Structures are given as C-alpha cells and as structure tokens.
C-alpha cells in the first residue's frame, strides 16, 4: 500500500485501489489504459480473501495481466497459477526463508513474462549473493513442515482469541466466522500463520509490553511468533483517513504465529 500510494505516481502510473470481491467494482475500475490487476490473498493485515479463479477469468477476458502476491499463504497452502494467474510473487524473506535472516523475493510465471522480469532485474539490480542462496536452499528443506505447524498453531490461537473477552474481532480465514471462509476453503489447503485481531479496551502498546514469549517486530513468517501494530508499523505513513478507508483501526494487532507450542 505504501509503495502504491507514495511511489507509483512518480513514474506516471495511475492506480485504483479496491478492497472487496465485488465484480461490479472491478468492472467499474477497469479503464482503457488498465494493464495489470495486482492482488494479495490473504491480504495484509486484515486477511481478506480474493476469489482467485474468478479474478483470473476476469483478467483473461479483458487481456489484463493478473498478479497475485502469495506471501501470506505460501506455496504450501495456495498456488494461484493453478487457477490461471499470470504471475505469482513471494517475499522469500517471510515463510520461504522462515528464519528472519534472508532478504529475497520470487516471481513465478510463464517464460515470456519471466524474461521481462529477468531483464529488468539485470538493469536495476537485485541479484542474490551465494550465501543468501545457500540460506534459501536450507529453508526450502523445512518449508512444508514449518508451514504445516504454523497452520495448526494459528487455527488454535485464532479460535482462542475469538472467544476471549478482551478481543473485539479476529481476522483469520480458517475460522468459519471469517466472511470469506468459503472462498478460502475452496482455494487453500491450509490457512497460514497470520492472524489479526482488535482489542476491546486495552492500549496496544501496553498490551505488547506485557507479552513474554512473543516479541514486537515488523517481519512475519518466521519460526518465532511476533506481533505488530499496523498503525505504528506497516501503515504508519498512511493518513488517518486512508487507514480508516482500508479498515485499519488503531486497536488492530497483527500476529505472525510461529512453530512454538500453541499453548505457550
């Protein structure tokens, strides 16, 4: 969101931001100059789910390039290419790396598009050094078992939070109460390790200070459980009006669930 709002206009790129599955909204948003539909599912930090197959068909029928950021789901839980998406991107810093010690990214797609991406990378930089590649290879060996455990833990933790008196709302696509749970169930094998929730009466800073095992940090997807407040981190640079429009409340916390024992 920060990149779109603050950087794209510098390059003369126009954009329209949408936050729902209403095809009517997408129909209205598409202009003659529209080239790309960029999606994130689950989204950060509200864990909204997009019907990937429906959007792939929508883009294909209008000759639009479809791109899905699959970071929150990981390839273990969701494969947008199977539903017709043109390009899939991952922040390998997160679940693929899994140990909070890598800065990297992946792009998946057909050869034509990847050739363009590769040429752009050559022109602007972005090559990984050998040691980073070694760490990525190490991480891929444990990706499945890590994410499977994070799936299990997140479902248990989100179910606990949903019944807690101090919590006003829980966002996790694996919960039957999630507004897009049926869509998630259709296209995901697991629901990931990301949860967001809104506190009722507690201050978000005081709450984080009381935590013992869980540390405040801005990354995600690692083996350790960490927490952050979007209003103070990822969405801090947005105006209050922009955050309100996106549904980012001041009492919202984002939890990246690790592989510890869920009871802890």
Task: Label each residue range with its predicted role.
Residues 155-218, 239-240, 244:
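Conserved small-domain helix->loop->beta segment predominantly found in fold-type I
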Residues 1-166, 171:
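Conserved PLP-enzyme active-site core in the AAT-like
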Residues 136-145, 192-199, 254-258:
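Short, well-ordered beta-strand elements within core beta-sheets of diverse protein domains
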Residues 94, 157, 174-178, 199-201, ...:
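Glycine-rich beta-alpha junction loops
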Residues 102, 191-193, 221-223, 249-251:
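A generic structural signal for well-ordered coil/turn residues at beta-strand boundaries
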Residues 98, 130-132, 186-189, 245-251:
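Short, flexible turn/loop "capping" segments at secondary-structure junctions
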Residues 5, 14-16, 28, 32, ...:
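PLP-dependent enzyme catalytic core of the Aspartate aminotransferase-like
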């Amino acid at each position: 969101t920060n990149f779109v709002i603050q950087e794209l206009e510098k390059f003369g790129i126009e954009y329209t931001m949408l936050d729902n599955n209403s095809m009517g909204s997408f129909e209205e948003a598409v202009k003659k100059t529209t080239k790309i539909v960029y999606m994130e599912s689950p989204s950060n930090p509200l864990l909204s789910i997009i019907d990937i197959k429906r959007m792939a068909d929508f883009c294909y029928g209008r000759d639009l390039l479809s791109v899905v950021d699959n970071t929150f789901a990981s390839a273990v839980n969701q494969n947008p290419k199977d539903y017709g998406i043109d390009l899939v991107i991952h922040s390998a810093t997160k679940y693929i790396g899994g140990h909070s010690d890598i800065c990297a990214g992946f792009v998946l797609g057909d050869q034509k598009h990847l050739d363009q991406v590769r040429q752009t990378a050559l022109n602007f930089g972005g090559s990984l050094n050998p040691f980073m590649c070694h760490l990525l290879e190490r991480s891929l060996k444990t990706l499945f078992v890590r994410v499977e455990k994070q799936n299990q833990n997140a479902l248990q933790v989100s179910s606990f939070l949903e019944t807690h008196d101090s919590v006003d709302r829980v966002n996790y696509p694996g919960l039957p109460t999630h507004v897009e749970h049926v869509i998630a169930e259709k296209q995901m094998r697991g629901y990931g390790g990301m949860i967001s929730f809104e506190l009722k009466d507690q201050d978000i800073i005081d709450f984080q200070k009381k935590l013992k095992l869980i540390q405040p940090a801005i990354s995600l997807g690692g083996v350790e459980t960490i927490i952050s407040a979007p209003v103070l981190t990822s969405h801090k640079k947005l105006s209050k009006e922009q955050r309100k429009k996106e549904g980012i409340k001041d009492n919202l916390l984002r939890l990246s669930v690790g592989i510890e024992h869920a009871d802890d």
